[in-house]
A protein has these predicted regions:
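Phosphate/nucleotide-binding beta-alpha loop and adjacent structural elements of enzyme active sites
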Residues: 1-259
Length: 259
């Protein structure tokens, strides 16, 4: 058993032995031990983007800690299962680093797990390609990920690319930036687990963090990958502000049958 295996098993054993409220208070204790400047950076990030809820101890707001504590308590067995089914050391270290950060606010291990050799998403040792690749980019933004794909793998290394983006102004930039490339489908739709209509929720910090919600506003059609793409899919990249799991559930047929 290597070092990361040992650390992961120890973390899992500790969390398994705690009640949900005990996990919550231990996370709070670990946060209190973090240097003040890092605390402020964390609070600014959580409160701006609201991925895990807000964090403002001076006002008694600990939503971020509550939600992560609930996730660790409810899903530790799922995380253990996932860890033992990962096929490479880097992925296991990354999972351990994430969970350890949730529990202990340990940023050292997350920094060690960050991959610097390759561009984001495209580890050439893990992700290969062929001329038959059908790539789906969920949250395509201005086309930066597609351009990175083309740089890393070449313009002949795909059959078709599907780009999904929900913000009209960003969608226009996406089309402009990628219009010179062949066989790219542009779809101004949200992607989830069911078809329907939702509403654009703008993020004041960055348009890249715009998301979907139920409150009235600018309507956005929502689809599923199983309904919207009929050909086999080989690669899905998803950065859609908390809708990733729903998008994967809506791609269940592709995931089960295309690989």
């Amino acid at each position: 058993m290597n070092e990361i295996d040992q650390k992961f098993e120890a973390l899992a054993a500790e969390i398994r032995g705690l009640r949900e409220k005990e996990i919550y208070y231990r996370i709070r204790k670990h946060f209190d031990q973090v240097p003040r400047e890092i605390q402020k950076s964390c609070m600014d990030f959580f409160n701006q983007f609201n991925y895990w809820g807000r964090l403002d101890p001076e006002k008694g707001v600990y939503e971020e800690i509550e939600e992560k504590g609930q996730a660790l308590f409810a899903h530790m067995e799922d995380f253990v299962w996932l860890y033992h089914h990962l096929g490479d050391y880097r992925s296991k270290k990354t999972l351990y680093a994430i969970l350890n950060n949730w529990y202990r606010y340990d940023f050292t291990t997350t920094a060690q797990a960050k991959e610097y050799l390759f561009d984001d998403y495209f580890d050439l040792d893990l992700v290969s390609c062929s001329t038959e690749e059908v790539v789906v980019d969920l949250g395509a933004f201005t086309g930066d990920t597609v351009l990175s794909y083309l740089k890393n793998y070449g313009q002949d290394c795909y059959k078709r690319i599907y780009c999904y983006e929900i913000t009209p102004k960003i969608f226009a930039l996406l089309r402009k930036n990628l219009e010179q490339y062949r066989d790219i489908e542009f779809r101004m739709k949200g992607v989830a687990d069911t078809e329907g209509t939702m509403f654009l929720v703008s993020n004041q910090t960055s348009a890249s963090a715009n998301t979907l919600g139920q409150e009235r506003g600018e309507e956005v059609p929502v689809t599923t990958l199983d309904q919207d793409i009929t050909e086999p899919v080989t690669l899905i990249k998803a950065d859609i502000e908390g809708f990733e799991q729903k998008a994967l559930e809506g791609a269940k047929h592709h995931i089960l049958n295309d690989h």
